[in-house]
Amino acid sequence: MKNSIVRTKTGVSYLYPFIVITSLFFLWGFAHSILDVLNKHFQEVLVISKARSALVQAVVYGGYFLMALPAGIFMKRFGYRWGVILGLVLYGIGALMFYPGSFLMSFNFFLFSLFIIGCGLTCLETAANPYVTILGEPEMSASRLNLSQSFNGLGWIVGPFVGG
């Protein structure tokens, strides 16, 4: 049987879940890299100061600070799959909140949306990092994690091109 970083010795393949989880690494790299682009747009469109626009990063990373432990507890109780689902739901809600925010033109509303996105990203990272390590043989877990993390970097590169 052909060796693979996502196949067990018994022949079970985890290729599909690995691809799905690895795409999440790209997603959160993209989300982080687009923050600076959003920041500049908020300064111009909403006419806010550079100091006030620093709240963009503060609320996203505040979501990490406040959600990290609850996300870990959630994962311990319900598992990685439900952690990924919770993260995607929160991320999606935060992103969808940008639509009414575009009508309200309220910086505070956008900040709340970004906070929800940050909470979702926290759940995704808390679940995806350990989950990708169990999708195959244990001795290949570092290789799987490194490969997945490389897509995070790709998201960081692509984000400003899409948002700019």
Regions found by a protein language model. Name each.
Residues Y16-I48, A128-N129:
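Extracytoplasmic
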Residues H41, G72-I73, R77:
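Membrane-interface helix termini in secondary transporters
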Residues L55-I73:
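Central cavity-lining transmembrane alpha-helices of secondary-active solute carriers
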Residues G63-M67, G120, G155:
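MFS transmembrane alpha-helix packing/gate-lining sites
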Residues V89-L104:
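C-terminal ends and interior cores of transmembrane alpha-helices
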Residues C123-E137:
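Intracellular juxtamembrane helix-capping segments at the cytosolic ends
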Residues M140-G163:
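Glycine-rich segments within core transmembrane alpha-helices of 12-TM secondary carriers
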